[in-house]
């Protein structure tokens, strides 16, 4: 009996050692994998060709270029419509893009009488930074932009509207957790927290393993951004009575409608001044196509098929000069044409709350 107990004790110790070794190996592989994911998905994004650029419209629209600090990096900012005095729309771009990726929206707001303040987030286009770092960076960069506006004698006097898409849609709502005088917010395809968005997106590639990696994602985010990593959009929305329009595509696969999207938390949002808009039309219900015209949507599909054909022809190694030549054939204005009704809906939301703001100030 004594030998049996000793043998059993030895076996348990051996199993425990194996378990601890496996746990350490899993932890090491997990942290290495997460580091790789962050370095890959949040790498630097530089300007692409084949889309609408300021050079296409510079004769019709003025623009002032400037820089402002965000942490250790200087960000590139752009001010459009300097003669407009209705208010200031601050535009925050999504992951993989820059301010110029949203030039069509910028020019639309300028045409409606707004000044527009757009900027390239850290590690994007004209801004400094070896990479974006993570989704929380957009919130830090927006705060830096708003601090810059606070110090500008002309801009700080204007009613402030926020417009953001995807990562930017998170930033413009989560920034409501802080003390800024915001008149109204439009969030398009925004997520509630960076962690939710990353776990959801990862699960589409590696399934249930994404949830096993949750503690490591949490820890890495905490190391990178501290408490900022866990700022929730819905907490910002509920913190005040700032009017917010939340727009989301029913078939969004990047930030899902009933998953990580802000709109999925609508039953937890108590702010009475929140408006929800669901996009369900076939060609305008995904993550990136909510505000484009039907013609632009169909043309973009045509362009995408052209890219696929080139990729097949050159076995996924398209020569740079061939890629550049194809880009030059793209009609950037046509590909960027917006859906007028969609844009008018947002503009009317801004204008109606602009009027309410002035009413409230006189009461």
Please place each PLM-identified region on the residue numbering.
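C-terminal catalytic histidine-bearing segment of alpha/beta-hydrolase fold enzymes
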Residues: 272-363
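Short alpha-helix in the alpha/beta-hydrolase fold that links the catalytic acid
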Residues: 256-266
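Short beta-strand/loop motif that positions the catalytic acidic residue
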Residues: 240, 246-248, 252
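Conserved alpha/beta-hydrolase
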Residues: 106-128
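Alpha/beta-hydrolase active-site loop
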Residues: 132-153
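An N-terminal hydrophobic leader/cap segment in hydrolases
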Residues: 15-69, 76-78, 304-326, 360-363
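Hydrolase active-site cap/lid region
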Residues: 174-226
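The serine-hydrolase catalytic nucleophile loop
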Residues: 95-108, 121, 258
